[in-house]
Structures are given as structure tokens and as C-alpha cells.
């Protein structure tokens, strides 16, 4: 029905729009209908050394976002809380088994409390509805937090990703052979675990099964069987089979791919004599990684990067200079040549399958073939998440799996071009990239000052290690615990001090205490209901303030990131906090500085913590509105009700946390938007001009770039927003008028004269 309405709207829109058209608009529409397929096209490339405004704004370092609107997420969160046992598998997946059992116990206790209350409605209704509202609120917030994983397929993403990487290298087996001999002909030994055995070992050890390709120089290959976890030594496949497979595959390559492969082979043959020795294997590995990273980036973009030959030539000439000083030129043996041709053909076929992650797939297999270190695997997966977002592991697939993956991601609206452009924006950050930029930074080792070429990731890694080593305070955790205990005992304390004075408290009996604790005659159902309410209030309130403490810790870490970043250009403070130091005396240094700024701003939890803070902000506004309405209804009797006192306690505690978050957020913004750093660097440039007049032109260029950077930061930086919501201006003004009008009415009623706290800006 909705689609028919949209079609009808589009039809009528075109119908009435036809009466407004002139000849020029009709001709343009006809040209657009014909399309641009017949237009001449040239091969192009994207310059990876340039930056986009997204890099300064921070959107280049994309974070995971939900594909479902917040209204649907709220509805699903409420349903999953109300029918908690029916969604047990989902709750176990997004939390853990122990937490699920604890939450299930709280859920069952809440159901029992509701049943007992409806049987004997004697207890105050606020004591029953309070925990229920907290449970619904936190369940909805948690559903909003984990919403980025809803569209992902369930199961072990690591194993699925590695299965697709294997198919990337081997190609589609159905097009070559129907049996396992195709893998043997390719000379690639893959390790696949049986479903039962693999799941057993994954459950037992908690590690991903790795497929290892080890091509040894002594004619053997080492395979690891996932079923028994024992190495199996196999003889290398004969070279004629590899050559026959390569000859058969050459006929399937396009002319452009064949020329590209031959160009890389010609570049590689020039130094193969120097790189074939065992002692210089590291240089050969760097050459292969460099070749694949450059060609992989060009194949991802669908463009031919014409400048890669010159880049490769410079890198390979450097490697030749390093190796010719040690070794004389020797003729490459037939084994090395066959292995090089085999790897080149396998890589070309992987890029031909149309996958955006082909170069990274072979890069990972190359690293896995050198060693079985878990650190390199973890680092590679982190790079995958950085360069291609959270969808990368499920998006890298071969042609044969396209339908299967599309069915898994039927609800995903992610444009595949987004990953391509994201890679180009971040291509210069990759360590194996020829365009990776480094800055000459100063580090201190004791009292010694040393220089070191560092990249953005290395500098940010040092900053993050300093932040992680920072001793966090526990003041707000203690505040949350105190408020939790106070709210749990509040109904009992309110009845106790309301009905008993200080003299009567000295001679109070246990039966009277039990009666005051229950709020009714202490019969068995009432006692059970009171104990359940106390336990529910204690646990759920602690969980709520625990989430608030997590948000406060995250904001504190953001502030520390910004603080250490602002100290990078200060020699004294950089030495004090043991972080790298460099000046903005070159254009490349400014580029690194801007990129590091955006990178650190996007590190750590972002959307998940913003969801928590936004929920707390809206809860605070709601409680403030309710309190104002209660005061306006009767300010003399406002404090007679226990729930009004409870509202005031909640409002005071939430305001303390929000003030803390607001102060940390504003200070973080000030650190990142500190224009005085750029102005100081401009002064330093003028000082250098005075000392080195021969470099005046170069320093003037850097000074102009600094001025542009200052203007750009002022243009893009926005003030800190605590609520983290993208709110319509009309809705925002209405909400502000309603809340501030209520506060104005309360103050006017208490003080005796009219006062206005709001003013609508046009």
C-alpha cells in the first residue's frame, strides 16, 4: 500500500510539474534519459596524498551506526523487555549468560511483585512502578546501544571472513574444477575445520581457527589441521602444474589486467636477483606487500593508478641500493620465478573477482604464512575495522556468494562506494602504503632527546597508552553507590521519620520496624512484596548509575585525549607527559596534526555513550517538568508525598552527573579548538624566517597553510551539545518553552512576581 501511494505521488508530481517546464528543461530531461553510457571515458585515479573536508570534520573515521530508525529500536526494546524470556537468545548474545540469568531473576521478581500488588493493592504504587520504569528505560537504552549489530549475520564473523578470504585467493572452484584438485594445482594448502570439531575447539579455546599457508624455501609446506591441531608436513606441488595452471588462467585475464601484471613483473624482475637470498627475505616481503597494497587500492577504486610505477620504482631502487652493497647480482632460479608468477596470477584472479578487500586478503594471508602470531592477526583485523568500517567482515565475498550475502544483508542500506572512498581517504595512513606520511618527532628517553619518524597511528598509540595508564578516580562511583543505597531505603526512611520522632526512635520495636518497612500490616504476601521491591530498587538503580559512571569515564578519557593532543607542539609539556613532540613547520606536519586531531576525536565509544547521555538528559527534563507541575498544583503540599521527595533526589543526582559531563565536554572542545596553538606556530615561523631568510618562500607557504587551517577549524567546529540529539528546531523551541515556562511559573509563584526565563530567537 505504501509503495502504491509513493508511485501515485510521484506520478502526480510529474504530471503537475510538466505544466511548469520550458524547452530547456525538457531537453535536459531527454539528455538525462539517454544517459552518459556512450560518452567517452578515460582511466582516472584518486590522489591519496590529498585530504578531504571529511578528514578535518572527523567523518572519515566512520563509526558504526544503526540501520533502523530510533522509533523502531524503541519499540523493539520495549517488546524485548516486556517479553524478556521469549528473547533469551538475543539477550544472551548482547550481554552474557550470567548477566542474562541475573536479569531473568529481576524480571521474574518484578512479575511476582505486580501479581502480589494486584492481589493486595495496599503498598504505595510508586514503589512498584519505579523499578518497572527503570527496567523499561534501561532495556530500551541497551537495545539502542547494540543496534549496530542487528543487521549483521549471527555466528562467528571471523571464521566467515576467513572462509571468504580463502575463496578470494582460490577463486570460484565451480568454474575451474568440481573437485579438490584445483586447490592442489594452485599450490595453496587451506585448512578447514569440520563444523562439529571446529565449533568444539572454538568453544573450548575461544580462538578463531586460522588457515595457514606456509611456503618454505626447502620444498615443504606446513599445514595446520583444525580438527586435530597438529601440523602436517606436505611436499610442495610440482612446478609444471603451477605453470600449466598459470597458462590456463592467462587466457581468462583481460588485457588491462595482463598488462598491469606484466608491468609489476618487469618491475620486480629488476631486483629479483638481489631479493632472492634467504638473509634478505624481509626486503622481499616488503616488496610483495607494497606491490599488492598499491594494486589492491587501484582495483578497489575501479581506476588505474598510473603513478604506482614511479612509486614502486623508487621503493624498489631503494631496496636495490640496500641489497647490492651486500650481495652480487645472481640469476633468479626457476623455483623463485615460478613462485613469483604463481603469486602474481593468484593475486590477479583475486582482484578479478570484484572484491573490495582483495589486496587486504592476500596481505593477511601473506602475514599469516610468515608466522602464526595472534598479535599480527589482531592488528590486521583492527586495520580492517578502521579502513572499512564494521561491515567489512561480512562484505568481502566472492561472486559465487553474492546472493547469500545479499540475503543476509537484506536490511542493510550501506553503499559499497562508501567503503571505496573511505579507503582512499585513509590510504595514506596505512603502514604498508607508499603514500604513508610520517613526521619527524622528538621523544625523550630519560634526559636524552631523540628524533624518530612516526605516523599518525604510532603517535596516537602512545597517547592512548598514556591515557590508559592514567589512574581514574572513583568519586562518581561512590556518589552513585550512595544515591543507590539512599533510594533503596528511602520509602522505609520516609515512613520512619514521618511517623516517629527522635524520642520514639529510641524505644522502637522490631515489629514496628517491619511494619514501617512494609508500609502495611506485615503479612506474608506484603513482606515478600516489600523485599522484592527493595531488591529491585537496589539492583536497577545501581545498574542505572553504573551506566552513568561508564559515560563519565568515557568523557574523562576524551578529555585526556584532547589534553595530550594539545601538548604535542609544546616541548615542555610533551616531555612532562612522555609523548612525542613536533612543530608545525612543514605542510606535511600540519596534515599529520589535523589527521591526528580527527583520529583522536573519534577514538573510543561514541554513539553508545551518547545514547546513554541523551537518555539521562531527557529523563532529567521529564522529572523537572513533573516537579514543576506538582509545585504549581500545590507548593504547600508538594513535600507531603514520598514520590515527590524521590523525584527531587533523582533530579539532584542526575544534575550532578550532567554538570560533570557538560564540564568535561566543554573542556574537551576547548582543547581541540585551541587556536592559540596555531597562532604560536605562526610566530615560530616568523622567527625562523628571521634566522633563515633563504627559506622565506617555503616558510611563507607553511604560514599560509596555518592561517587556512585556523579558519577551517573555526568554520567546522561546533559548540558542545550534551544531549547529543539531532533535534528539529521547532521541536527544540517548543520543548524549551514548555520546560522554561514551567520553571518560570514555579519561581513566580514562590517569589510573588512574574519572571520570564525564556526568549524565542527568530
From Swiss-Prot:
Compartment list: Endoplasmic reticulum membrane; Golgi apparatus, cis-Golgi network membrane
Membrane disposition: Multi-pass membrane protein
Annotated spans, Disordered: 152-188, 344-379, 393-415
Sequence ranges of Basic and acidic residues compositional bias: 365-376
Glycosylation sites: 179-180, 197, 431, 674, 733
A GO cellular component annotation in the UniProt record: Golgi apparatus
Bias-annotated ranges (Low complexity): 348-361
Domain PHTF positions: 6-150
Keywords for the protein's UniProt record, in alphabetical order: Endoplasmic reticulum, Glycoprotein, Golgi apparatus, Membrane, Phosphoprotein, Transmembrane, Transmembrane helix
Protein name per Swiss-Prot or TrEMBL: Protein PHTF1
PANTHER family registered for this protein in UniProt: PROTEIN PHTF1 (PTHR12680:SF8), PUTATIVE HOMEODOMAIN TRANSCRIPTION FACTOR PHTF (PTHR12680)
Oligomeric form and interacting partners: Interacts with FEM1B.
Pfam families the UniProt entry points to: PHTF1-2_N (PF12129)
Transmembrane annotation, as ranges: 77-97, 99-119, 121-141, 473-493, 512-532, 611-631, 645-665, 737-757
Positions bearing Phosphoserine: 272, 276-277, 334, 336
Primary subcellular site in the record, as a coarse category: endoplasmic reticulum
InterPro entries: PHTF1/2 (IPR039775), PHTF1/2_N (IPR021980)
Source organism per UniProt: Bos taurus
Amino acid at each position: 500500500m505504501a509503495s502504491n501511494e509513493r508511485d501515485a505521488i510521484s506520478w502526480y508530481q510529474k504530471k503537475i510539474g510538466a505544466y511548469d517546464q520550458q524547452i530547456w528543461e525538457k531537453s535536459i530531461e531527454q539528455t538525462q534519459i539517454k544517459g552518459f553510457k556512450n560518452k567517452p571515458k578515460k582511466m582516472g585515479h584518486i590522489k591519496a596524498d590529498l585530504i578531504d573536508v571529511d578528514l578535518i570534520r572527523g567523518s572519515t573515521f566512520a563509526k558504526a551506526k544503526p540501520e533502523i530508525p530510533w522509533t523502531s529500536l524503541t519499540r523493539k526494546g520495549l517488546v524485548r523487555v516486556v517479553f524478556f524470556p521469549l528473547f533469551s537468545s538475543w539477550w544472551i548474545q548482547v550481554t552474557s549468560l550470567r548477566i542474562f540469568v541475573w536479569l531473568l531473576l529481576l524480571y521474574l521478581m518484578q512479575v511476582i511483585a505486580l501479581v502480589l500488588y494486584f492481589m493486595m493493592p495496599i503498598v504505595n504504587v510508586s514503589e512498584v512502578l519505579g523499578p518497572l520504569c527503570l527496567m523499561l528505560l534501561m532495556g530500551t537504552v541497551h537495545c539502542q546501544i547494540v543496534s549496530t549489530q542487528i543487521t549483521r549475520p549471527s555466528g562467528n564473523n571471523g571464521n566467515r571472513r576467513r572462509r571468504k578470504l580463502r575463496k578470494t585467493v582460490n577463486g570460484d572452484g565451480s568454474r575451474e574444477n568440481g573437485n579438490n584438485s584445483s586447490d592442489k594445482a594452485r599450490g595453496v594448502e587451506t585448512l578447514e575445520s569440520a563444523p562439529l570439531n571446529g565449533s568444539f575447539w572454538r568453544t573450548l579455546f575461544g580462538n578463531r581457527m586460522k588457515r595457514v599457508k606456509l611456503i618454505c624455501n626447502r620444498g615443504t609446506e606446513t599445514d595446520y589441521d583444525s580438527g586435530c591441531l597438529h601440523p602436517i608436513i606436505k611436499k610442495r606441488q610440482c612446478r609444471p602444474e603451477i605453470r600449466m595452471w598459470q597458462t590456463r588462467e592467462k587466457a581468462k585475464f583481460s588485457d588491462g589486467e595482463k598488462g598491469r601484471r606484466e608491468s609489476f613483473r618487469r618491475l620486480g624482475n629488476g631486483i629479483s636477483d638481489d631479493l632472492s637470498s634467504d638473509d634478505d627475505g624481509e626486503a622481499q616481503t616488503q616488496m610483495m606487500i607494497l606491490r599488492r597494497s598499491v594494486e589492491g587500492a587501484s582495483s578497489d577504486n575501479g581506476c588505474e593508478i598510473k603513478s604506482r610505477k614511479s612509486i614502486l620504482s623508487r621503493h624498489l631502487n631503494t631496496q636495490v641500493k640496500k641489497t647490492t652493497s651486500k650481495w652480487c647480482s645472481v640469476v633468479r632460479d626457476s623455483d623463485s620465478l615460478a613462485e613469483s608468477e604463481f603469486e602474481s596470477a593468484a593475486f590477479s584472479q583475486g582482484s578479478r573477482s570484484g572484491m573490495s578487500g582483495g589486496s587486504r586478503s592476500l596481505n593477511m594471508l601473506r602475514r599469516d604464512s610468515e608466522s602464526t602470531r595472534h598479535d599480527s592477526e589482531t592488528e590486521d583485523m583492527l586495520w580492517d575495522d578502521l579502513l572499512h568500517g564494521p561491515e567489512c567482515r561480512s562484505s568481502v565475498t566472492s561472486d559465487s556468494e553474492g546472493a547469500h550475502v545479499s540475503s543476509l544483508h537484506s536490511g542493510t542500506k550501506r553503499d559499497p562506494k562508501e567503503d571505496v572512498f573511505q579507503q582512499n581517504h585513509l590510504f595514506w595512513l596505512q603502514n604498508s602504503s607508499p603514500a604513508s606520511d610520517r613526521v619527524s618527532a622528538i621523544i625523550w628517553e630519560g634526559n636524552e632527546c631523540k628524533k624518530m619518524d612516526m605516523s599518525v597511528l604510532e603517535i596516537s598509540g602512545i597517547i592512548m597508552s598514556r591515557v590508559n595508564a592514567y589512574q581514574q578516580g572513583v568519586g562518581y562511583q561512590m556518589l552513585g553507590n550512595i544515591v543507590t543505597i539512599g533510594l533503596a531505603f528511602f520509602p522505609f526512611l520516609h515512613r520512619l521519620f514521618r511517623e516517629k520522632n527522635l524520642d520514639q526512635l529510641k524505644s522502637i520495636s522490631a515489629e514496628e520496624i517491619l511494619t514501617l518497612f512494609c508500609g502495611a500490616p506485615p503479612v506474608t504476601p506484603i513482606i515478600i512484596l516489600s523485599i522484592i521491591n527493595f531488591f529491585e530498587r537496589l539492583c536497577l538503580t545501581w545498574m542505572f548509575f553504573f551506566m552513568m559512571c561508564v559515560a563519565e569515564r568515557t568523557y574523562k578519557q576524551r578529555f585526556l585525549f584532547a589534553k595530550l593532543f594539545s601538548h604535542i607542539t609544546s616541548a615542555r609539556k610533551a616531555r612532562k607527559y612522555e609523548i612525542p613532540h613536533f612543530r608545525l613547520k612543514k605542510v606535511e606536519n600540519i596534515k599529520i596534526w589535523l589527521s591526528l586531531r580527527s583520529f583522536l576525536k573519534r577514538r573510543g565509544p561514541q554513539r553508545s555513550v551518547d545514547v546513554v547521555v541523551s537518555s539521562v538528559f531527557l529523563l532529567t527534563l521529564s522529572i523537572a517538568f513533573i516537579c514543576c507541575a506538582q509545585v504549581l498544583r500545590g507548593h504547600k503540599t508538594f513535600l507531603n508525598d514520598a514520590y515527590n521527595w524521590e523525584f527531587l533526589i533523582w533530579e539532584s543526582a542526575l544534575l550532578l552527573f550532567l554538570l560533570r559531563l557538560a564540564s568535561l565536554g566543554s573542556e574537551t572542545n576547548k582543547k581541540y579548538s585551541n587556536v592559540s596553538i596555531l597562532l604560536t606556530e605562526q610566530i615560530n615561523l616568523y622567527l625562523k624566517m628571521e634566522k633563515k631568510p633563504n627559506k622565506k618562500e617555503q616558510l611563507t607557504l607553511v604560514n599560509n597553510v596555518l592561517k587556512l587551517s585556523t579558519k577551517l577549524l573555526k568554520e567546522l567546529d561546533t559548540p558542545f551539545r550534551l544531549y547529543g540529539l539531532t533535534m528539529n528546531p521547532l521541536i527544540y523551541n517548543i520543548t524549551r518553552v514548555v520546560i522554561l515556562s514551567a520553571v518560570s511559573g514555579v519561581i513566580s509563584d514562590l517569589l510573588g512576581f512574574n519572571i520570564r526565563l525564556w526568549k524565542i530567537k527568530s
